[in-house]
UniProtKB/Swiss-Prot annotation:
Known catalytic reactions: L-serine = pyruvate + NH4(+)
Cofactor note: Binds 1 [4Fe-4S] cluster.
Family, similarity comment: Belongs to the iron-sulfur dependent L-serine dehydratase family.
EC number in record: 4.3.1.17
Organism: Escherichia coli (strain K12)
GO terms, molecular function: 4 iron, 4 sulfur cluster binding; L-serine ammonia-lyase activity; metal ion binding
Protein known as: L-serine dehydratase TdcG
Keyword entries, A-Z: 4Fe-4S, Gluconeogenesis, Iron, Iron-sulfur, Lyase, Metal-binding
GO-annotated biological processes: amino acid catabolic process; gluconeogenesis; L-threonine catabolic process to propionate
Enzymatic class: lyase
Pfam families: SDH_alpha, SDH_beta
InterPro entries tied to this protein: ASB_dom_sf, Fe-S_L-Ser, Fe-S_L-Ser_mono, Ser_deHydtase-like_asu, Ser_deHydtase_bsu
Signal peptide as annotated in the record: none
Amino acid sequence: MISAFDIFKIGIGPSSSHTVGPMNAGKSFIDRLESSGLLTATSHIVVDLYGSLSLTGKGHATDVAIIMGLAGNSPQDVVIDEIPAFIELVTRSGRLPVASGAHIVDFPVAKNIIFHPEMLPRHENGMRITAWKGQEELLSKTYYSVGGGFIVEEEHFGLSHDVETSVPYDFHSAGELLKMCDYNGLSISGLMMHNELALRSKAEIDAGFARIWQVMHDGIERGMNTEGVLPGPLNVPRRAVALRRQLVSSDNISNDPMNVIDWINMYALAVSEENAAGGRVVTAPTNGACGIIPAVLAYYDKFRRPVNERSIARYFLAAGAIGALYKMNASISGAEVGCQGEIGVACSMAAAGLTELLGGSPAQVCNAAEIAMEHNLGLTCDPVAGQVQIPCIERNAINAVKAVNAARMAMRRTSAPRVSLDKVIETMYETGKDMNDKYRETSRGGLAIKVVCG
């Protein structure tokens, strides 16, 4: 089973596959080096980046993330404000304190992080980290960042990464999920709660979801109150703060019956801009799509009913179930299947979560998820200048609104759907694999080569 807490992970921007994953890999490697008794013998460490990690690594802060991971930091607890000074110190000195300062290695950044445009054989996001004692190799590990902050060591690639604990309802498809819900008289969130209770206590579950929502809510607050220009060569101005100012001050806008769309846009822009600035966000299921799920829950909170502990849990459990299906049966990596695996999956998850809160049946929840993905099929991942900004930020806003629409369409539907969620997941994966790699997070095609920086 893939837990909802595997799908929703607290980390930092701008990318789950290119920032969170590499930081996790760096931390995993240095922990392995220390536990093997090889740390103090290490003179220097070399990092090789391959494929999409190389081609968009600079714009996604992959190099920074790996350095911070080797230093002993995890995405969920790294002190964001201390990163720039630490990177400057390492760059200037050519020395890297690793394992929380337990040892210092030679690390001339420009020489020891090597960018290779070619891909490793198993996945588009590959990296190899090697520890050396002079000319002697002490330890070398190859990692793949497979989306959503998940990393897989090469020797474990292709193996199941499900939680090994036995759960009462072990589903592997939407069809199985719906049958289990129907037979046991459970909602999707109810079934997921039974599974989560096999892994942790109710108090831990509630506290975990409360923490996830708090980080999302904090991202909205920061994003809609922060002026300025986002980092990087594109000089993209923050838009959420100006939109918020219009929404709270203009009677004309506030009386517009469509103003709810502007609020949803503002929520999504706020979180996505925080992500682009390297702020604290939640993979949902990725950083590139991290604005959609919080925006839809914020919409429900403001315009439908104030959220509480129970509704927050129901939303994340239902959305997490859908995210798990994509993770098991397709991909949530833009480098593997294009943006349909990030924005498309987030839209599908948010539509499912909202339908759950609106009182939809399990079938309606799955239909909302299917509608949302059906109209994201073929969506390319072509970040301009390798930044998670254009088209990513605006795309979050558009698809947050689309998720609400998909939920409403599913709730109002009176005819039986002709396309199942399982079929659209299968189609998404096949479509992504058929895409030219120019459109899979390499910045070699699409908008990425049409928009001029500056």
